[in-house]
Design a protein with these regions (language model features):
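Short, contiguous clusters of charged residues that form electrostatic/catalytic patches at enzyme active sites
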Residues: 57, 61, 96-100, 152, ...
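Residue-level signature of the cytosolic catalytic core of signaling kinases
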Residues: 51, 185-189, 257, 306
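Residues that form or immediately flank small-molecule/cofactor binding pockets and catalytic motifs
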Residues: 53, 136, 172-175, 212-214, ...
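Short, flexible, glycine-rich and Lys/Arg-enriched loop motifs at helix boundaries
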Residues: 39, 171-192, 202-223
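C-terminal substrate-binding subdomain of Rossmann-fold SDR/epimerase-dehydratase oxidoreductases
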Residues: 195, 201-332
């Protein structure tokens, strides 16, 4: 049984990846400082070391106590608007700490590294056509630049060390584990599906549509949404590709279909059975009108296919919000 280390494994995407690897027969060790991650969302079968990835003594302990085959790196900061007002934090948490982590792992002989990147590395693609892995990389905010920096660093380190790496560029991640084992408990979330579902269950009074005058069919931004469980399975498939082939890989992870902001809100209203309070607001700086993945590469090379559509994302997200409400009521 291979053992993988997952940084940020108590976070939204990380906790789903933990279940994905456990379900696939791996042993999972997690390093998470729980600054945004939730201990209760972590699979009981995973062993947690609470602390920061910058703590080399902690990492040394993990590597001495376990034979780590590879590392999946999710830890970091992930809110685009926040990165604009506090860029230093994003370069520190995402770029510099990732550099230190990779440097340490290589020095300890870790073979494989799978990095959680983002479609933010593409910036504002022209024309609205789906973007492939070969599209222009032109981030427009510190979050995107911090991710691209790590991508470049991993490639360069691999060239001289032989580190076997994978890079997954996520589009808009949504939904929760269909089995109800974990979900999105992100504090002050900005993800559209999460926010709309919080409004539906009464956690928020309403939500805003940032821009209604885009050159899209209904005037609102169009995005490619991918279910978090599909994304977890993409990590397993990519990791097994690295193990099997010894080749490096970079893949987009998306459905290849676009849904507008208004479409998503209507779908939440339909699933919930009530109208949400929605207000129009000014455009946000740097929001492309359309951002859709060309995920041909991962489909052809790994046979990965998305199993869940937008309705599944919304139904599982709503189920998680209702569960959190019930848990809160039981505690109070």
């Amino acid at each position: 049984m291979l053992t993988v280390l997952i940084t940020g494994g108590a976070g939204y995407i990380g906790s789903h990846a933990v279940y994905g690897f456990l379900d696939a027969g791996y042993k999972v060790v997690v390093v998470d400082d729980l600054s945004t991650g939730i201990r209760e969302n972590l699979a009981p079968a995973a062993q947690l070391y609470q602390g920061n990835i910058a703590d080399r003594d902690l990492l040394d302990t993990v590597l001495r106590q376990h034979t780590i085959d590879g590392v999946l790196h999710f830890a970091g900061s992930a809110a685009v608007p926040e990165s604009i007002v506090d860029p230093a934090r994003y370069y520190r948490n995402n770029a510099f700490r990732s550099l230190d982590l990779v440097d340490f792992l290589v020095s300890r002989g870790v073979k494989r590294f799978l990095f959680s990147s983002s479609a933010a590395v593409y910036g504002m693609p022209a024309g609205g056509a789906p973007v492939s892995e070969a599209s222009l990389l032109n981030p427009i905010n510190p979050y995107g630049w911090s991710k691209l920096f790590v991508e470049r660093m991993v490639r360069d380190v691999s060239a001289v060390s032989g580190l076997n790496y994978g890079i997954l560029r996520y589009f808009n991640v949504a939904g929760s584990d269909p089995k109800g084992r974990t979900g999105q408990s992100t504090p002050n979330a900005t993800h559209l599906v999460k926010v709309a579902c919080e409004v539906a269950v009464g956690k928020r009074d309403g939500l805003r549509i940032y821009g209604t005058d885009y050159d899209t069919p209904d005037g609102t931004c169009v995005r490619d949404f991918v279910h978090v469980t599909d994304l977890a399975l993409a990590h397993v498939a990519t990791y097994e590709f690295l193990c099997r082939s010894g080749r490096n890989a970079c893949f987009n992870c998306g459905n290849g279909k676009g849904h507008s902001v208004r479409e998503v809100i209507r779908a939440v209203e339909q699933a919930h059975g009530h109208t949400l309070h929605v207000a129009a607001a000014e455009r946000r700086q740097g929001d492309p009108a359309t951002l859709i993945a060309d995920a041909t590469a991962i489909r052809k090379m790994l046979g990965w296919r998305t199993l869940y559509g937008l309705d599944d994302m919304i139904h599982t997200a709503l189920a998680w919000e209702h569960r959190e409400q019930r848990d809160l009521m039981q505690v109070s």
